[in-house]
Amino acid sequence: MDERLPERAHLVTEQVNPDSARLDRLDSPSLVELFCREDERVVPAVRAAAPAIARAIDLTAAALRGGGRLFYVGAGTSGRLGVLDASECPPTFCTDPEQVQGIIAGGTAALTRSVEGAEDDPEAGAAELAGRALSAADVVVGISAGGTAPYVSGALAYARSLGGVTIFVACVPTNQIPERWDIEIRVPVGPEVLAGSTRLKAGTATKLVLNILSTGAMVRLGKTYGNLMVDVAVSNQKLRDRAVRILTTLTELERTAALALLEASGLRVKVALLMHWSNQDPASCATALEAAGGLLPVALEKLSGR
């Protein structure tokens, strides 16, 4: 065997799915039914990885609380999913864009088109993190459906060399790709409907894992109140409306009064809530919130104890 071209036939992500062997013969309703049936494998696979995902949430939240950052690193579909999840954190949780970052092999050009060979360079993955001043305070989540992308392994190895937390997300079992990293989130969903096309079930499973990881970490950081998005960045009309509805829900104010409260707070939902509940001015509420590490109940207790 040519060592320059490693054999991947043993990987479940590369295997042929016998249930879709007649894919090219199916009519459209049958195609839809087949895809739906295969996608039913995804949630159980993610649920089976729940203990590892929970540990990843806790380590990530601790790192972010201490001033560290979260980096997603991947190639192709895996990289795009990481960039997607990272890009949703600022509007959803009002995070600094530097706090959660997505890195894709081949750079931004690879978001819309394939960059040939980009995933095959382990040094490039490490160099990208070095260029972003990675430190031991940070968390790196390497995403590789088949578990073999050198770009991802290079990034994880660099993170480990600095003492940072390393998390690996893959859709192959450990008997195919052995464990190497601090946390291994394995979500094997079986062969794809279209053999080797990991943008399908593997991509769906990866998206679910990242959804849970980032949202769970933000919940731990106090970015929600109950299940409400109280740290939403009010950057457009849709989000302004959402912020007003959050205020009406939690304060029982009428919509007009809630909008006035939001504007008085500087479009900061948490500050607006503290203003309403404590009858304090915006600056005092913002100061209490900062002192409480962004935790709304703790900030309210500080204000109420004055």
From Swiss-Prot:
Homodimer. Residues 60-223 form the SIS domain. This is N-acetylmuramic acid 6-phosphate etherase. PROSITE patterns: GCKR, SIS. A lyase-type mechanism (elimination/hydration) is suggested for the cleavage of the lactyl ether bond of MurNAc 6-phosphate, with the formation of an alpha,beta-unsaturated aldehyde intermediate with (E)-stereochemistry, followed by the syn addition of water to give product. It comes from Gloeobacter violaceus (strain ATCC 29082 / PCC 7421). The keyword Lyase applies. GO terms for biological process: amino sugar catabolic process; N-acetylmuramic acid catabolic process; peptidoglycan turnover. Specifically catalyzes the cleavage of the D-lactyl ether substituent of MurNAc 6-phosphate, producing GlcNAc 6-phosphate and D-lactate. Its EC number is 4.2.1.126. InterPro entries: Etherase_MurQ, Glucokinase_regulatory_CS, MURQ/GCKR, SIS_dom, SIS_dom_sf. Keywords: Carbohydrate metabolism, Lyase. The keyword Lyase applies. NCBIfam families: N-acetylmuramic acid 6-phosphate etherase, PRK05441.1, PRK12570.1. Belongs to the GCKR-like family. MurNAc-6-P etherase subfamily. One of its GO terms (molecular function) is carbohydrate derivative binding. The gene is murQ. It catalyses: N-acetyl-D-muramate 6-phosphate + H2O = N-acetyl-D-glucosamine 6-phosphate + (R)-lactate. The active site is at residues 88, 119. Pathway: Amino-sugar metabolism; N-acetylmuramate degradation.
